[in-house]
Amino acid sequence: MIYLAGGCFWGVEEYFSQVDGVLDAVSGYANGRGDTTNYQLIHQTGHAETVEVAYDANRISLKELLLHFFRIIDPTSLNKQGNDRGSQYRTGIYYTDKADLAIIDEVFKEKAKDYKKKIVVEKAPLKHFIKAEDYHQDYLKKNPNGYCHIDINQATYPVIDESKYPKPSATEIKEKLSADEYRVTQKNETEKAFSNRYWDSFDAGIYVDVVTGEPLFSSKDKFESGCGWPSFSRPISPDVVRYKEDKSFNMTRTEVRSRSGNSHLGHVFTDGPKDQGGLRYCINSLSITFIPKADMEAKGYGYLLSSVE
């Protein structure tokens, strides 16, 4: 069991109820003054809107849950998430098992690198948890158009642990990559269209960063765009890519880079299939390596098989 405060509990509860491996998500109030409060009193009693998350550790780890949690909050915002303001909307991770603190600290340390501002998420033992009123439970299931400050759909995307795919040193990168791979990933060059290794390949599997091995795209989201480069409707997870404005060649485009390796991957455009979200990730074959579905388990990517099937 872990207790997560991430702003309005309606969205947090609904998000975690959709995460594979979560057994139950319950809205409530935690770590205020005293063990009695309600929705009308929490701004006076100092409790935080919190979700009790029960999970099967054989299906999802605490670290994976916390990576999901950081996906849906702004950890640098004090007493504010989305449009909600007040101490009851502060972020926090409250634990009942002291052994969990080491994992929480590990995630904090890793996530601190992603932000210029200080992380202000509370981490503390759970003092008390008071279940919220019945009308708050499963609120968004009962009120599908109700207020929610987070993107619930992201719950279905896999969490990919960046620490498993560290970036090699500059010397190691140069030794590992071919001259062409180096020019594309490190010097932002573009390979030739229609003569690269993956533009017309549609076998089942995943595509990973050629530098770090971090998973980036799934064959399930690959489509024939006619542009001569591999095209995808979305990344395998929203967490694994970064975006940058690119004004080279007298154009304004959105560059796509890998998260861990900071490799130049390509660009994203808005002329993709409408029924798949309307985006086209135009990616250099030299920036990625294909892992066939049959090899994913042996190469450590078995946890992503459901993203291919």
Curated annotation (Swiss-Prot):
Q: What superkingdom heads the lineage? A: Bacteria
* Disulphide linkage map: none
Q: Which residues form the active site?
A: 8, 282 (nucleophile)
From its record, what is one biological process in GO terms?
Answer: protein repair
Catalysed reaction per UniProt?
L-methionyl-[protein] + [thioredoxin]-disulfide + H2O = L-methionyl-(S)-S-oxide-[protein] + [thioredoxin]-dithiol; [thioredoxin]-disulfide + L-methionine + H2O = L-methionine (S)-S-oxide + [thioredoxin]-dithiol; L-methionyl-[protein] + [thioredoxin]-disulfide + H2O = L-methionyl-(R)-S-oxide-[protein] + [thioredoxin]-dithiol
| One protein family per Pfam | SelR
Q: Which UniProt keywords apply?
A: Multifunctional enzyme, Oxidoreductase
Task: Name the top EC class.
Answer: oxidoreductase
The molecular function terms in GO held by this entry are:
L-methionine:thioredoxin-disulfide S-oxidoreductase activity; peptide-methionine (R)-S-oxide reductase activity; peptide-methionine (S)-S-oxide reductase activity
Cellular compartments per GO CC:
cytoplasm
Which residue ranges are recorded for the region named Peptide methionine sulfoxide reductase A? 1-153
> Oxidoreductase: present as a keyword of the record?
yes
Under SUPFAM superfamilies, the record lists: Mss4-like, Peptide methionine sulfoxide reductase
Q: What is its EC number?
A: 1.8.4.11, 1.8.4.12
Q: What residue stretches are annotated with the MsrB domain?
A: 170-293
Question: What is known about what this protein does?
Answer: Has an important function as a repair enzyme for proteins that have been inactivated by oxidation. Catalyzes the reversible oxidation-reduction of methionine sulfoxide in proteins to methionine.
Family annotation (NCBIfam families):
msrA, peptide-methionine (R)-S-oxide reductase MsrB
Q: Return the similarity comment.
A: In the N-terminal section; belongs to the MsrA Met sulfoxide reductase family. In the C-terminal section; belongs to the MsrB Met sulfoxide reductase family.
HAMAP family annotated for this entry? MsrA, MsrB
Protein name as annotated: Peptide methionine sulfoxide reductase MsrA/MsrB
